[in-house]
């Protein structure tokens, strides 16, 4: 499946050996591609460090309204790379336990950056999402899978725990506790068809339609108010952590008032409907 599709590679975002690519396939859309297909885009530190850098730069690129995250070749991400883990930066003279902590923190940062990104993130899951790759997909706001994709909580198969990189937090919230327990404790594969049925992904599409389906979702979101989209993403995530309904409604209400009182977006929406045209939100008064 072609992932470059005449998109422009932004030189400023490219790592030295292009293990992470950032392209602009459509206006206001950035596509971040894990580009190590010979290792099924495994989460080696040589890939995760430039991914973290790319996310940081895209976050402050105000021309980007939506991010699409995908993998090159036939896989989304196979998770940990047991043969070529890469190099963790800034670990000189550290003992093995501290080195391990720095390694874990780096991977944790990537997951949290996806959540904190100003822009919505769509995971275009183009193939296997295994172990940490499943975690990476779950950290996105929206997931769309190709028909050939599948998902596996692989830690349990490797004699470890299946709980890593927020998986035991994110998966039950996505699909419910019983299904999450079963998938994580058995380490079985979840097909794209099943993933769609249980809500792990929003939809599955034929392989060749994956990116276009994601671009269509992204383009729709990009047409809405910037603070409206950003605050909706923020409250959706904070809702997963909310201690009470009352506290969360307060946060929602403040966000709604912020956009309603400080912009003319609502008036524009009403006028656009009356005039039977698409609204143009300026996010200003």
From Swiss-Prot:
Q: Name one GO molecular function term.
A: enoyl-CoA hydratase activity
Q: Does the keyword Lipid metabolism apply?
A: yes
Q: Catalysed reaction(s)?
A: a (3S)-3-hydroxyacyl-CoA = a (2E)-enoyl-CoA + H2O; a 4-saturated-(3S)-3-hydroxyacyl-CoA = a (3E)-enoyl-CoA + H2O
Task: Tell me the keywords, alphabetical order.
Answer: Fatty acid metabolism, Lipid metabolism, Lyase
Task: Please state what class of enzyme this protein is.
Answer: lyase
Identify the Gene3D superfamilies for this entry: 2-enoyl-CoA Hydratase, Chain A, domain 1, Lyase 2-enoyl-coa Hydratase, Chain A, domain 2
List, alphabetically, the Pfam families matched: ECH_1
- The UniProt record lists the EC number as 4.2.1.17
Q: Which CDD domains match?
A: crotonase-like (cd06558)
Single Gene Ontology BP annotation: fatty acid metabolic process
Q: What is stated as this protein's family in its record?
A: Belongs to the enoyl-CoA hydratase/isomerase family.
Name the NCBIfam families for this protein.
PRK05864.1
Q: What does this protein do?
A: Could possibly oxidize fatty acids using specific components.
Q: What name appears for this protein in its UniProt entry?
A: Probable enoyl-CoA hydratase echA12
Q: Which gene encodes it?
A: echA12
């Amino acid at each position: 499946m072609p992932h470059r599709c005449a998109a422009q590679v932004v030189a400023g975002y490219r790592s030295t050996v292009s293990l992470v690519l950032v392209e602009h396939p459509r206006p206001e859309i950035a596509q971040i591609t894990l580009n190590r297909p010979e290792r099924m885009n495994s989460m080696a530190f040589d890939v995760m460090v430039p991914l973290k850098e790319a996310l940081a730069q895209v976050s402050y690129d105000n021309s980007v309204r939506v991010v699409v995250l995908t993998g090159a070749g036939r896989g989304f991400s196979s998770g940990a790379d047991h043969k070529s883990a890469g190099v963790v930066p800034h670990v000189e003279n550290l003992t093995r336990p501290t080195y391990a902590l720095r390694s874990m923190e780096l991977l944790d940062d990537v997951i949290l950056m996806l959540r904190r990104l100003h822009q919505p993130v769509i995971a275009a899951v183009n193939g296997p999402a295994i172990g940490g790759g499943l975690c990476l997909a779950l950290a996105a706001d929206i997931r769309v899978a190709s028909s050939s994709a599948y998902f596996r909580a692989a830690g349990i198969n490797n004699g470890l725990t299946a709980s890593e990189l927020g998986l035991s937090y994110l998966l039950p919230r996505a699909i419910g506790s019983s299904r999450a327990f079963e998938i994580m404790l058995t380490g079985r594969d979840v097909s794209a068809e099943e993933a769609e049925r249980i809500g792990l992904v929003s939809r599955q599409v034929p392989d060749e339609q994956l990116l276009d389906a994601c671009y269509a979702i992204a383009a729709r979101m990009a047409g809405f108010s910037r603070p409206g989209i950003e605050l909706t993403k923020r409250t959706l995530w904070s809702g997963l952590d909310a201690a009470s309904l009352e506290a969360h409604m307060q946060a929602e209400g403040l966000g709604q008032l912020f956009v309603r009182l400080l912009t003319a977006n609502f008036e524009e929406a009403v006028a656009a409907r009356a005039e039977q045209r698409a609204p143009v939100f300026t996010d200003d008064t």
